[in-house]
């Protein structure tokens, strides 16, 4: 059982620095999985150094973390925002579902580095559990849509 309260207690701190945290997460994603950059047309063929402080990466960071925050705040009752997120990523962005697992795993790592006192082992486990459920629910939407990407 996921402790959504623990997740949301840290998420409130995340919201005060959404852009910087999102930038760190996206840049780490691109560093660890360079092929992921190809799914972002504005970021294709650019070095991490070129992307670091651009308006485009900041805007994408806000978009990604705002969407994730909207889901997290639902405390498990997230079917509508998950369906909406999956729909755009299936039809418009065509991003394979395994990238959700990759980015949420990176998010736990980045949050643990940025908030070491708040992100103790129990809170990390709560985040990992929450993200696992969210990613599983997103994957169900992909399967229902018969995604071939």
Swiss-Prot record:
Monomeric. Signal peptide: none annotated. It is found in: Cytoplasm, Sarcoplasm. Monomeric heme protein which primary function is to store oxygen and facilitate its diffusion within muscle tissues. Reversibly binds oxygen through a pentacoordinated heme iron and enables its timely and efficient release as needed during periods of heightened demand. Depending on the oxidative conditions of tissues and cells, and in addition to its ability to bind oxygen, it also has a nitrite reductase activity whereby it regulates the production of bioactive nitric oxide. The gene is mb. GO terms for cellular component: extracellular exosome; sarcoplasm. It catalyses: Fe(III)-heme b-[protein] + nitric oxide + H2O = Fe(II)-heme b-[protein] + nitrite + 2 H(+); H2O2 + AH2 = A + 2 H2O. Keywords: Acetylation, Cytoplasm, Heme, Iron, Metal-binding, Muscle protein, Oxidoreductase, Oxygen transport, Transport. It is an enzyme of class 1 (oxidoreductase). This is Myoglobin. PROSITE patterns: GLOBIN (PS01033). Residues 2-143 form the Globin domain. The modification N-acetylvaline is found at residue 2. It comes from the Eukaryota. It holds the Pfam family Globin. Heme b binds at residue 89. GO terms for biological process: removal of superoxide radicals. Belongs to the globin family. It comes from Mustelus antarcticus (Gummy shark). One of its GO terms (molecular function) is oxygen carrier activity. InterPro entries: Globin, Globin-like_sf, Myoglobin. Its EC number is 1.7.-.-, 1.11.1.-.
């Amino acid at each position: 059982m996921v402790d959504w309260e623990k997740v949301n207690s840290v998420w409130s701190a995340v919201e005060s620095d959404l852009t910087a945290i999102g930038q760190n997460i996206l840049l780490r994603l691109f560093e660890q999985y360079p092929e992921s950059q190809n799914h972002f047309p504005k970021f294709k063929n650019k070095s991490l150094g070129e992307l670091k402080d651009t308006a485009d990466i900041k805007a994408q960071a806000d978009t990604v973390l705002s969407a994730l925050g909207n889901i997290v705040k639902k405390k498990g009752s997230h079917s509508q925002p998950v369906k909406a997120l999956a729909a755009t990523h299936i039809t418009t962005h065509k991003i394979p579902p395994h990238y959700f697992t990759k980015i949420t795993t990176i998010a736990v790592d980045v949050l643990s580095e940025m908030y070491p006192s708040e992100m103790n082992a129990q809170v990390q486990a709560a985040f990992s559990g929450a993200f696992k459920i969210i990613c599983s629910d997103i994957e169900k939407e992909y399967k229902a849509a018969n995604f071939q990407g």
